[in-house]
């Protein structure tokens, strides 16, 4: 399947002025998705951070890395992530997402949930530095 197969029709999953979700089913074929997961696991210099919840410091049950302009950072829950420059393969993926979506993306938080015990509870990504109504692409 061509990555930009014109048969891909976005499906709107929510109403306007709420969390708007557009879903492109089968945007990647299984082989390409498997390659991207493998490359992510092996090539990203993953961070393991801790978070303070109800007075306890615990490891965040996932690994993560923040990509973007190296002069920028992202802070949530008192965790400051200094941006790492996009590797070429993630930058190419970002460009493909921009073409498909018609939107621009300048940074990426990449998460690695290692197994069934890694997870993050329901939460709001409402940091002011993300701006009003931030746009998120999720793969």
Language-model-detected regions and their locations in the chain:
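Non-heme Fe(II) oxygenase metal-center motifs and adjacent flexible, charged/small-residue loops
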Residues: 1-138
């Amino acid at each position: 399947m061509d990555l930009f197969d014109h048969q891909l029709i976005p499906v709107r999953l929510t109403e306007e002025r709420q969390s708007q979700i557009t879903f492109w089913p089968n945007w990647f074929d299984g082989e390409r998705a498997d390659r991207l997961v493998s490359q992510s696991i092996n090539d990203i210099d993953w961070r393991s951070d801790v978070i303070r919840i109800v007075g306890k410091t615990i490891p965040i049950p996932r690994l993560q890395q923040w990509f973007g302009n190296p002069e920028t950072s992202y802070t949530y829950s008192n965790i400051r992530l200094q941006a790492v420059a996009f590797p070429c393969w993630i930058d190419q993926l970002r460009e493909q997402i921009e073409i498909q979506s018609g939107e621009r993306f300048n940074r990426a938080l990449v998460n690695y949930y290692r197994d069934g015990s890694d997870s993050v509870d329901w939460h709001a990504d409402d940091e002011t530095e993300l701006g009003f109504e931030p746009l998120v692409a999720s793969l």
